[in-house]
Curated annotation (Swiss-Prot):
Pfam families: CofD. GO terms for cellular component: cytoplasm. CDD domains: YvcK_like. Residues 317-359 are annotated as: Disordered. GO terms for biological process: regulation of cell shape. This is Putative gluconeogenesis factor. The keyword rRNA-binding does not apply. SUPFAM superfamilies: CofD-like. Belongs to the gluconeogenesis factor family. It is found in: Cytoplasm. The keyword Cytoplasm applies.
């Protein structure tokens, strides 16, 4: 489905099951897909490992690796192994094998990106899976509706607590504030010809990416086509009762000046012309064109990877004339707002394998 002469480079940002479906769609267009994954999970196996070992939470990273695993029997076998979760009631209960592998390799190699690259080689991944930041983060949120007075906000900290809150999330922040972006993630965004944000948990998987200064600067600077994929339904907890337009408003509030070219939404989510016109008006906040297409798996609130791939290919071909950024432009991207970022053609080989610039 890739048009002749088009560089096959797709970057997908997100986390959890939303990112998994985007990666499953993107790999139908090209084997060279880069996943940039949130690193604030504090529940389940990931929460235990980050608390006990101080590692980047591996759960969403593991799922992204499984989504991009080779279709060979060997690749699929290792994807199954990676996802296998121990049962029982002992110390290993609830831990997926892949989480333990990534945690162990991160300690051995002293670099989470190198650990991901090594597991990716085992799986036959031709693209790359990267954490959005090289350190574990926390999310905190201002939530209303938990007190008798609806004007009073309560501070809720932690991804699991925010995702399940019965209140209304008003704003989220990352801790530490203004965290550094993973250098290879910035490189990948700058080298891409299509960047996809969403679908997924809006406040805990989508918005965190635009709260990392280095990432949002790269997203603004890249020549890639930028697409936002909206959820098929408002999720329970953090976005319960949200309209489609409200999702766009809160994204724009968290990242002033951030824009996308295209917004993809399932046609059945916005069935009548009045609602579609309201969404088009809201999309002007992001300077985006809205595409009403069939991307749902029949009878479910899940995206169909094949249909989503068709939709992504449709917006991708709108960027055929874009050229790759210059080295000078890439060097201006800052990882933490303090020091310039080395460009995609900058020196390599001075650190662990995972610290090499992406090729």
């Amino acid at each position: 489905m890739i048009s002749p002469g088009s560089p096959p480079s797709i970057v997908a940002l997100g986390g959890g099951h939303g990112l998994y479906v985007t990666l499953s769609a993107a790999r139908r267009l090209t084997p060279y897909v880069t996943a940039i994954v949130t690193v604030a999970d504090d529940g389940g196996s990931s929460g235990r490992l980050r608390s006990e070992l101080g590692v980047v939470p591996p759960g969403d990273l593991r799922m992204a690796l499984a989504a991009l695993a080779s279709d060979s029997p060997y690749g699929r076998l290792w994807a199954t192994i990676l996802q296998h979760r121990f049962g029982g009631s002992g110390a290993l209960a609830g831990h997926p094998i892949g989480n333990l592998m990534l945690a162990g390799l991160s300690e051995v190699l002293a670099d989470p990106v190198a650990a991901l690259d090594e597991v990716g080689r085992i799986l036959g991944v031709k693209g790359r899976v990267l954490p959005m930041c090289p350190i574990a983060l926390q999310i905190e949120a201002d939530v209303s509706g938990l007190e008798a007075d609806p004007r009073i906000f309560r501070l809720i900290r932690g991804q699991v607590a925010i995702a399940s809150t019965p209140g209304k999330v008003r704003r989220v922040r990352l801790l530490p504030v203004d965290p550094p972006a993973t250098r290879q993630a910035v490189d990948a965004i700058m080298a891409a010809n299509l960047v996809v944000l969403g679908p997924g948990s809006w406040f805990t998987s989508v918005i965190p990416h635009v709260l990392v200064p280095g990432l949002v600067t790269a997203l603004r600077a890249t020549t890639a086509r930028r697409a936002l994929v909206l959820n098929l339904a408002a999720g329970p907890g953090e976005t319960a009762g949200f309209s489609v337009e409200r999702h766009l408003h809160v994204l724009a509030q968290h990242a002033p000046g951030f824009t996308v070219h295209d917004i993809i939404i399932d046609a059945d989510r916005v069935p009548n012309n009045r609602e579609r016109e309201q969404l088009r008006r809201a999309a002007t906040l992001l300077q985006a064109e809205v595409h009403f297409v069939d991307v749902a798996r029949p009878g479910t609130s899940l995206h169909d990877p094949g249909k989503l791939a068709t939709a992504l290919d449709g917006v991708r071909v709108g960027n055929q004339d874009s050229s790759a950024p210059t080295v000078a432009a890439t060097e201006q991207i800052r990882l933490d707002g303090k020091r310039p970022q080395t460009g995609v053609n900058g020196p390599v080989g001075k650190g662990p394998r995972g610290d090499d610039a992406w090729r």
